[in-house]
Amino acid sequence: MYNLIHFAYTKSHNYKTEKSIFNIITGKKSHQTFFDACSQQLLSLYHSMPKLKYPLFEQYSSNSNIQEQQIQNIISHPRHTYDSLLNTFNAIQLLTQTLSNTQHNNYQFIPITQHRVVHQKVKYLYKKISDGHLEKSFIAELTLLFQSLTKKNNDIYIHYYLQGFEESMYTRQQISLIEEISQEMLFELEMRDLITLMFEIENEEKYPLLHNLIILPTLLNKTQKTYLGIQNGLNFKQLAAQQNVKPNTIDDHILELFIKGYITDYDSYLDHIEYKPFMTYYIANRSERLRNYKDTFSELSYFEIKLIIVGVERGELNVT
């Protein structure tokens, strides 16, 4: 935990408070926290330590006994929260467990997870694999995935959590004893493995089956309503009227949809402005306050500035 919190400090903007970092790590459900996480490349730490209490966080953050080598082990993902990483891996676990058991004609097993969205994803892909007789293709992709993880991370640990026919998974405590690593350090290394895994399976060409198991971060309930409204063709004013909220609330919902990957069509919201100059400026001056960007680029609204920042940090908007 010391190392994760220290890593968050190294990535955060100077003007951000300790409370802002605490909100990201514990997963505060606010649009400001979503934007803070995305704009500082800390999205994969969002909700990674939901049970952490503020006094303990302060104690960790003031600790200076940090090993630089340990910090180098920590990486972040710009497009997925910790829950998204974990749910996606749970889907891989469940599909592996299901295929392993059904190939041995065992249909009476306790699923690794009861998560509804995970089950939906796995059910869809399991049917596709079964109907197309793609079991060998799945095994080949899974093998390639873990070979790639090993090549990139040298030692990997999440393979201990795979479960199959008459093969139970290990607990973190057991892995800690086997590998002679503290459970805190193991948590950090597992997070590194999960992030590397997500970078890998985002490549649909390389992983045409496993790519289907990516689970996006969960939306807030009101943002979900906005998303359905957008899919039904409603505009800003109609969306605001539908939920009886101010237009800037809908702005926040739309930003959340971009931050969490539900919408990627930036031009639909930026087609009326020339935003490349701001992108160039932002990339060279990433740590400024929003009002400074607004003062320099007064023709842009705060929503547009935030949206461009989200696009840049997610790697979806480029100057060239």
Question: Where are the regions that the model predicts?
Answer:
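Long, charge-rich, low-complexity intrinsically disordered regions
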Residues: 1-320
